Structure formats: structure tokens, C-alpha cells
């Protein structure tokens, strides 16, 4: 089934508006910020005396690549003259590995009731979160074909396997129960306005040195939502905190769920093209037939029947904290999922300064980028409020040659 021009314009307009609203903050590092502070807080449980429920608000944005620096990525997104040195530098950084780029941005509001449920150790809790994430990967050969051409590839096979691009956004409103140590489980209603994804399963491209023989083959598929989808998602946390144990352990499961997508537009390509030359005109393949309207429609199939069940890009976080002294500690965290090509590993040192300030430094590896530093600071206000800022790759904020930027802000009532 073909998509009408009017429908395609609406989809493009929607994506443009959403990108314009979110790209300035672009991807994110939504880690368990409250967990980093637990091990060095005093053993007291202050009560919020305001009329509002205990709550926290977290906002984040981050983008990261292992090959493209901020300057080249900005030119590719916004347009402009691209200097060849930027292209060559990104190609040298990629080497023979897959190039990757990812982003994540959004916010999460979490609240819980003051009183326990009917004289139990459980209380009601809930959250509202909005997220937008994206993931793209490409082979070195595809990078060359797109940005520099195939002049240096004549006589060799270019491999495109594993190249992909995908993006999605969703809103999750959840309600659940929370027990001791903030252990909780929530079930949420998910609204997903859009998702698109494309993947080249196998792809090859070859032109001989005499430039008179071409071979191209591709098996790929793509899918784009035409209507908003609805589904269910589960969030859960478990925190091991014991006075007799010299350490703390945290497990967080986020956005484990499924979405029902009605009538998505699906494309499939399974084509092999071989030629040793094309006539100007005539029956079959010719230069004239390549220019005819609708020629490309014979290379793929499309349909939009039925519904699809699609998994949300959930994430699992495992955190370990070990106090080195009453005011210092060592943290280790591993994050899995959320379309990251590699697990993200984090290790850091934290210290408390007086009763109201904490700060820490970290080293991050994996995810969408190479090894990079991070730093955070937390201010516990006298009125039982706290504010925290987390910056990934802080030196990258002042340099166009950085491979990404990220910031997370959190405000909470204690």
C-alpha cells in the first residue's frame, strides 16, 4: 500500500516539530541519582512538611557517537559546508568498527503517598515519564559511499550488513506500590505517538576497476508507524540496604512493556542487481527506464495490514556502592538495553562535604561512545529539598571536537 503525499507530509511535519523541541538537549544519562547519595547520608528520615506529596523531577538530554564529533554531527543535522578534514577524522576514528550514534532525552516525575496503606509497610506511588531515543549504526564502507564516494573502493566488495536507524518516543503514566528502602513496582499505560526503524540484514556493493561491471544486493526491511500506539509498561526498583552490610546494591527495571501498533507501514527489500552496462533505451533495463516514474517501486514491497506488537526499549540498571569512609564511597554501575549497542559501565568516587553537599567523579565506557569522564554535585537544602546536576564529558561542552554531550538535572523533596 502506498502512503499518500499528504500523509507523508504530516509525518515529516510531526518529526520536524518533535526534533525542534528536543534536539537542543539531545540524549541522556538517566541513572539512579538518589542511589548515589544514600550511602553517605545520615541515618535520619526527615518528613516533608509541605502540603505536597514527596516527589522528584528528573530531566535529561544527551547525544553520543564513537566516530562523529559534535561539529560534524551538527553540520549533518542542520546543513552547511562540510570540511573534508572533518570527514577524514571521523573515518579514521571509526577504523574497521561499526560507527554508532545515539541520543536520549526526556523527563520523569515521581511521587508517593505520605501514609502507609492500611497499616502495612506499603504506600501508593506513581510516575509520569516522557522519553525520546534514537539509535543509528553504519559500516565503514557505507560511510565512505555516502560521504566520499567509491573511487577508492573499485575492485572490492563493500559490506553493508548491520546498518540500521531507528527512533521512538513515548509517554508512560504509571501507578504502583512502594515499600521499605523505596522498593517499588509500577504498572503504566503507554502512549507512543511514533516509531520508525530500518535495518539492512545483508547488503553488498561492487564495482570493478574498469567501471563497467556492477553488482548490488540487499535484504532489508523498514517499518514506520502511521497511527499512535497504546500499550503497557512495568517499572520496578529493589534496593538492598542493611545496617549490618558494609555495602548497598540496587536494581532498577524501566519500561519493560509492549505496544500495540495499528496498521504500521512496512517495507521489505530482497533484490540483486547485476549489470555490465545499460543501453540508452529499449525493453528491460536501460538508462531511460531508470528515469521513469515508479521504477523504484519494483524493487520493494509495502503493506500496512494488521497490527504489530512491538517491545518498548526497556533498560536494566545494576548498581553497587561501597563506603570507603563515613564521607567517601566507591560506586559501580552497569546499564543494559534501551537500544545501546554495548552495555554501559560506570565507576566513580564520591565524597560528602559537610551536611549539605556531595560531589563525585566517574569514568564511563560503552553505550554509544568511547571512554569518557563525568561529574556530579548534589545540594541538600535546609528545607528538606535537594538539587542535583550530572554532566557527562564536562570538557566536551567547550569543544566542537567532543564526541557527545550530556546533562541530567534532578529536584526532589525528601
Q: What annotation goes with each model-predicted range?
A:
Residues 57-59, 124-128, 183-189, 249-251, ...:
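Membrane-embedded beta-strand positions of outer-membrane beta-barrel proteins
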Residues 114-120, 180-182, 241-245, 323-327, ...:
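Outer-membrane beta-barrel channels and translocator barrels
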Residues 235-241, 250-254, 260, 283-358:
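Detector for outer-membrane/organellar transmembrane beta-barrel domains
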Residues 1-48, 414:
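Cleavable N-terminal export/targeting peptides
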Residues 29-228, 244, 266-290, 389-391, ...:
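A subset of solvent-exposed loop/turn segments in beta-rich extracellular surface proteins, enriched
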Residues 108-114, 174-178, 235-239, 319-321, ...:
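Outer-membrane beta-barrel architecture
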Residues 229-233, 261-263:
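Extended, H/D-rich, highly charged conserved domains that either
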Residues 327-339, 345-369, 373-377, 385-397:
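Transmembrane beta-strand segments that form the barrel wall of outer-membrane beta-barrel proteins
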Amino acid at each position: 500500500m502506498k502512503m499518500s503525499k499528504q500523509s507523508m507530509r504530516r509525518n515529516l511535519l510531526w518529526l520536524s516539530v518533535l526534533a525542534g523541541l528536543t534536539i537542543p538537549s539531545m540524549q541522556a544519562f538517566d541513572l539512579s541519582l538518589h542511589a548515589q547519595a544514600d550511602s553517605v547520608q545520615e541515618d535520619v528520615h526527615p518528613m516533608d512538611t509541605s502540603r505536597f506529596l514527596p516527589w522528584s523531577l528528573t530531566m535529561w538530554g544527551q547525544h553520543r557517537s564513537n566516530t562523529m564529533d559534535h561539529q560534524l554531527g551538527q553540520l549533518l543535522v542542520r546543513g552547511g559546508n562540510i570540511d573534508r578534514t572533518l570527514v577524514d577524522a571521523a573515518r579514521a576514528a571509526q577504523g574497521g568498527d561499526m560507527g554508532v550514534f545515539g541520543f536520549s532525552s526526556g523527563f520523569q516525575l515521581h511521587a508517593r503517598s505520605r501514609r502507609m496503606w492500611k497499616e502495612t509497610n506499603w504506600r501508593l506511588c506513581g510516575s509520569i515519564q516522557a522519553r525520546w531515543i534514537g539509535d543509528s549504526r553504519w559500516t565503514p564502507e557505507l560511510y565512505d559511499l555516502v560521504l566520499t564516494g567509491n573511487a577508492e573502493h573499485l575492485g572490492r566488495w563493500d559490506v553493508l550488513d548491520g546498518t540500521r536507524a531507528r527512533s521512538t518516543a513515548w509517554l508512560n503514566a504509571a501507578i504502583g506500590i512502594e515499600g521499605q528502602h523505596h522498593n517499588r513496582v509500577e504498572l503504566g499505560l503507554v502512549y507512543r505517538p511514533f516509531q520508525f526503524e530500518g535495518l539492512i540484514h545483508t547488503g553488498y556493493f561492487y564495482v570493478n576497476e574498469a567501471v563497467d561491471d556492477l553488482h548490488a544486493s540487499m535484504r532489508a526491511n523498514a517499518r514506520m508507524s502511521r497511527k499512535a500506539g497504546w500499550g503497557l509498561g512495568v517499572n520496578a526498583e529493589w534496593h538492598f540496604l542493611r545496617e549490618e552490610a558494609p555495602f548497598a546494591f540496587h536494581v532498577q527495571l524501566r519500561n519493560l512493556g509492549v505496544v500495540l501498533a495499528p496498521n504500521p507501514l512496512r517495507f521489505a527489500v530482497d533484490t540483486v542487481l547485476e549489470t555490465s552496462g545499460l543501453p540508452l533505451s529499449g525493453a528491460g533495463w536501460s538508462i531511460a527506464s531508470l528515469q521513469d516514474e515508479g521504477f523504484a517501486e519494483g524493487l520493494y514491497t509495502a503493506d500496512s495490514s494488521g497490527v504489530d506488537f512491538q517491545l518498548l526499549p526497556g533498560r536494566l540498571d545494576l548498581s553497587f556502592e561501597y563506603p570507603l569512609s563515613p564521607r567517601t564511597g566507591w560506586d559501580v554501575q552497569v546499564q543494559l538495553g534501551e537500544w545501546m549497542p554495548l552495555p554501559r559501565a560506570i565507576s566513580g568516587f564520591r565524597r560528602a562535604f559537610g551536611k549539605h553537599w556531595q560531589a563525585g567523579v566517574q569514568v564511563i565506557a560503552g553505550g554509544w561512545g568511547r571512554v569518557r569522564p563525568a561529574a556530579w554535585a548534589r545540594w541538600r537544602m535546609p528545607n528538606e529539598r535537594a538539587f542535583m546536576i550530572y554532566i557527562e564529558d564536562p570538557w566536551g561542552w567547550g569543544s566542537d571536537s567532543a564526541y557527545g554531550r550530556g546533562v541530567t538535572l534532578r529536584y526532589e523533596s525528601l
